[in-house]
Amino acid sequence: MENYFPSDQFSLEEYRLNNFDLRSLSDEQLAEHYKEYGKKEGRVISCIGNKQEFLNLLLGKTSLLEIGVFDAPSLDFLAQSGDTPLIHYGDYLGRDDLIARASQVGRNPHSVPEIRWVLADGYEQIDVDYDAVVSHHCVEHQPDLVAHLWDIKSILKSGGWYLFSIPHKNHCFDYFIQESTIVDVLTAYYLRYKKPSFKSVLEHRVFTSHSFRDGINPYNSEIPHMKNLFQLAFDEFCDNEYVDAHCWQFTPCSFQKIIQQLNAFELIPNINELKVYPAGVEFYVAIAFA
């Protein structure tokens, strides 16, 4: 099998190079540190340690689509490359709606790119076969992970790539929420979720924590007014066709395991290569489909 991507395995050299606080450790101490702490922390272990290094894998590709772009397109640097690739952007909303939303939530309306595909209208409309699709912090918002991967495969050339980043659940407001399991993914698939489940909306609205490093666990709360928050989350779920919420909570290891299982079960498009690169607060996933 051909290897398209750099290794995602633990490298002593890269671990030392990318973790400044560990540079004085011996090889033996580095290996022990990774085993005891670094793996759980999602520290950089390979030559792919930041978003730019990850996106550089796309150099030479000539047709690209970035989805879930909002006001932060990440492929503009490729437009200046000698290959002058075709670059399209897609989002659930159209450009005018994204500009309005950016103004409302304190984002940059001037950075919203031209939206070629409004994904609320489905992937069937897309009549371009791309070399690669890219997304950042988009996958965790997909109600049905299996269906999402089939959608992506449907707009790729044979052997096309899907490159994406996902927040590490232990480094964001999802800290106290349990990791998603294969059963969660299978439930969403067999029930054909088209929007986040009430469980996901409730977790996202009530049980996330932006002060998780202080150990304030919302799951331990006995505050009476929490009942009002539960009702608000339920009303939002019932009154809207779609709610923007995290449907999944992953670590690099848990995500890799679930994708490997789905591939073995033949529930997702056949994968030629899968690499997962930890990078601290997020991790990067490179998939080459058959």
Task: Indicate where each model-derived feature is located.
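Charge-rich, low-complexity intrinsically disordered regions
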Residues: M1-N50
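Generic anion/oxyanion-binding catalytic loop in active/binding sites
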Residues: Y4, H137, D244
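Class I SAM-dependent methyltransferase Rossmann-like catalytic core
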Residues: C47-K61
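Eukaryotic beta-rich interaction modules
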Residues: I48, I67-F70, L267-N270
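A general structural signal for short secondary-structure junctions and capping/turn motifs
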Residues: F54-L58, F77-S81, K157, K275-P278
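Conserved SAM-binding loop
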Residues: T62-I177, V285-A290
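S-adenosyl-L-methionine-dependent methyltransferase catalytic module, highlighting the catalytic core
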Residues: G106-Y123, A147-K153, W161-F289
